[in-house]
Curated annotation (Swiss-Prot):
Upper taxonomic lineage: Bacteria, Pseudomonadati, Pseudomonadota, Gammaproteobacteria, Aeromonadales
Pro-peptide positions on chain: 446-492
Keyword Signal annotated: yes
Keywords per UniProt: Cytolysis, Disulfide bond, Hemolysis, Host cell membrane, Host membrane, Membrane, Secreted, Signal, Toxin, Transmembrane, Transmembrane beta strand, Virulence
Official protein name in the record: Aerolysin-4
First and last residue of the signal peptide: 1-23
Gene: ahh4
Family statement drawn from the similarity comment of this UniProt entry: Belongs to the aerolysin family.
Compartment(s) where it occurs, according to its Swiss-Prot or TrEMBL record: Secreted; Host cell membrane
Amino acid sequence: MKKLKITGLSLIISGLLMAQAQAAEPVYPDQLRLFSLGQEVCGDKYRPVNREEAQSIKSNIVGMMGQWQISGLANGWVIMGPGYNGEIKPGSASSTWCYPTNPATGEIPTLSALDIPDGDEVDVQWRLVHDSANFIKPTSYLAHYLGYAWVGGNHSQYVGEDMDVTRDGDGWVIRGNNDGGCDGYRCGDKTSIKVSNFAYNLDPDSFKHGDVTQSDRQLVKTVVGWAINDSDTPQSGYDVTLRYDTATNWSKTNTYGLSEKVTTKNKFKWPLVGETELSIEIAANQSWASQNGGSTTTSLSQSVRPTVPAHSKIPVKIELYKADISYPYEFKADVSYDLTLSGFLRWGGNAWYTHPDNRPNWNHTFVIGPYKDKASSIRYQWDKRYIPGEVKWWDWNWTIQQNGLPTMQNNLAKVLRPVRAGITGDFSAESQFAGNIEIGAPVPVAAASHSSRARNLSAGQGLRLEIPLDAQELSGLGFNNVSLSVTPAANQ
């Protein structure tokens, strides 16, 4: 019996520890519902909000209550309206604040990128800001949902239609057409959407290339010499190794001037295409057009392990080649920009966190692209909308209550949709390399052979090389620091 009691106590303690280990989950005010079904009674797939949850979003709940309203929470608690300063205390009420048992995450979907064809910078911008379906309407509806007035032209009753797009310095302004007159309070004060501060960042994973034109390897030099065994025993335990540095000369041309504005976020290495040995790097935060050609040096080696009979020599042949390669290339650049909304806020309802009712003129800038700060980040404000006092700009819970969660998710996904511009050009390179070291049939020798024009190398055990290497000539062909060595094999 004592053993059973101890086991039961252990289960209780384990349950408490598991409950304590579970982290608190956010409660999004836009998903709250007030049910008038009795004390702590909710509709299907809802549960009562507990005291801790209500405390975390008290200002949001109180803002949705009548002056003297009292509504229930879980476990015998109630929350009281603004006339009671939102007090939370034990009590009972006929209505209950409830929350979904399986709440929607409410995340902003990430859409596939909007690809803009390659062109000059102004071409890329023009295509973006004149795209009605993918840009003008989504940004216009964003302004409308936030409470900006008159986000449309005089010749249409719909948001985002009859809009004029004009160049403004290095940016663009989108505003409803004001021709022909209008009716309504300050209807001539159309909300404007300014698009400015464009930036372009190279996406290295987007590399594509067209048809590759690659020349067959061209023989530029043949070096012939001898491996000579002057000893009385066959020699097969030595490696003959050719080492050299070779330069690959490369160049790239950029089809459009937009490449001058494209930067690399991280150090970028050019992808290898074909058989050329190439190592091109562009430093982080550099213009794509800052490096359009150069030379890269690669250290290479070839080895062979010949078997040379006693008092014999075998011919050694090394062939040196060059190869050319060229192809058109394309990368994508991620486009980012500032989106500035300017106009007056509607008195009948707006999403500024203080909800002013005096129709104030309001400017606010969002950054579409990499995170800059909280005030300009739609995604940050949206994700933190469950924390009262954290988001001191727009009341996204209000926009959801007014327009619905799916509507806001769909609109913000379009506003935040990635935009990519094509960067195209042509690439070419020339490289040099050595073929395999070829070994011929042995030839008997009567005595050691020497040549004043040859490189004479010995392993100190009777095997030596006589191979002519003209450093100046080889350098002119693109081969530098050429060396031949004969060394005991490491894995005999």
